[in-house]
Amino acid sequence: MGFFRHLFSLSLCALSLAIPSKLIGLENTQDVIPNSYIVVMKSTISEAEFQTHQAWASKIHRRNLGERDETLGGLDGLKTTFEFEGLKGYSGAFDKRTIELISRNPAVDYVEVDRVVKLDAITTQRNAPSWGLGRISHKSAGSSDFVFDDSAGSGITIYGVDTGIDIKHPEFGGRATWGTNTVDNEDTDQNGHGTHTAGTFAGATYGIAKKANVIAVKVLNAQGTGSTSGVIQGIQWCTDHAGRNGLKGKAAMNLSLGIRGSTVFNRVAEAAQQSGIFLAVAAGNDGFSPASARGVCTAAATNSQDAATSWSNYGSVVAVYGPGADIISAYPNEDTATLSGTSMASPHVCGVGAYLMALEGIGPDKVCDRIKELAVESVTNQKLNTTRKLLYNGSGA
């Protein structure tokens, strides 16, 4: 019997090897996390088939490690799964032989290498005067007054997918709560970036949607780094939370982080948007691939003179420009800081999106089009094939 089981196992391997490998992302090795992969299943796979596949993948992983008579430190096999409408998959750490077999499995659509995710922000100085709020509420530059409707994002929940948020900061006035942590065991913002972006989209002083609720979703550590798989896990938590709490159609998400061109990330972002959450995404700085997922609102950055910043990414995927240079906002421990980057432009877009959802009652799938409709054509120094539209909240000023 042992002989026949071994023969059957070899036959399965031979069958798998007859199917072309579907491992993608190897053409660019920058920021790749060694031996870490994201497996995406065919869209037609059932829940039962998905469970069966996971058991098979785990068995293959254990067998291959056993044949090498070694544990290969860090190769833990299957770690986390994700499930969105029409999209199932998992992430894990596997040796090359195992991931090759997984990639050739008929139930697998493709396998993508996992990558390091980084922040885009550039710290400049503390406690400098802010200009972004005045700019987005006036059709012309020059005013420091923020003009807005008193609804101010009331009834909308914003997920800050970032380094965490100092939820006790006075800027949030009890409207901020902790959600989840997919990167470490420190349920606080040890970096400051997440608190800063949250202060822009929903802070009482520096924010746009001043009455929105805020939920901290930590996917990046104190150094501002994480992984594609960890970000996916965080987005999964947001969609599940929105579904359980009746927030779909009344929720927004800010993603001020840099992910190099990722097919699976784009699909996850699209799935989150289609589930009923408005997504604002940073275009990226200095060569980072812009978020090109359909339906998300991608933000590039301008300075106080309405000029596109030299470090902001560009291209046809940019939906709108937003203030991104020398932006003052909340910082951990009741502090403030001034940061620059498309990371700062994205929360302006997110805040205006939440503001419009509350004010006009529009759904998440209509928000980005409405933002582009309201925006003013005032950006200068923009690059080829990039919009001139600058974020505007429609105040009438």
From Swiss-Prot:
Residues 1-20 form the signal peptide. Its main location: secreted. It is an enzyme of class 3 (hydrolase). GO terms for biological process: proteolysis. One of its GO terms (molecular function) is serine-type endopeptidase activity. Pfam families: Inhibitor_I9, Peptidase_S8. It is found in: Secreted. Glycans are attached at residues 254, 385, 393. Keywords: Glycoprotein, Hydrolase, Protease, Secreted, Serine protease, Signal, Virulence, Zymogen. The keyword Secreted applies. Residues 36-119 form the Inhibitor I9 domain. The active site is at residues 162, 193, 343. InterPro entries: PCSK9_ProteinaseK-like, Peptidase_S8/S53_dom, Peptidase_S8/S53_dom_sf, Peptidase_S8_Ser-AS, Peptidase_S8_subtilisin-like, Peptidase_S8_subtilisin-rel, S8pro/Inhibitor_I9, S8pro/Inhibitor_I9_sf. Residues 130-397 form the Peptidase S8 domain. GO terms for cellular component: extracellular region. Residues 21-120 form a propeptide. Its EC number is 3.4.21.-. CDD domains: Peptidases_S8_PCSK9_ProteinaseK_like. Secreted subtilisin-like serine protease with keratinolytic activity that contributes to pathogenicity. Belongs to the peptidase S8 family. This is Subtilisin-like protease 9. It comes from Trichophyton verrucosum (strain HKI 0517). The lineage of its organism: Eukaryota, Fungi, Dikarya, Ascomycota, Pezizomycotina.
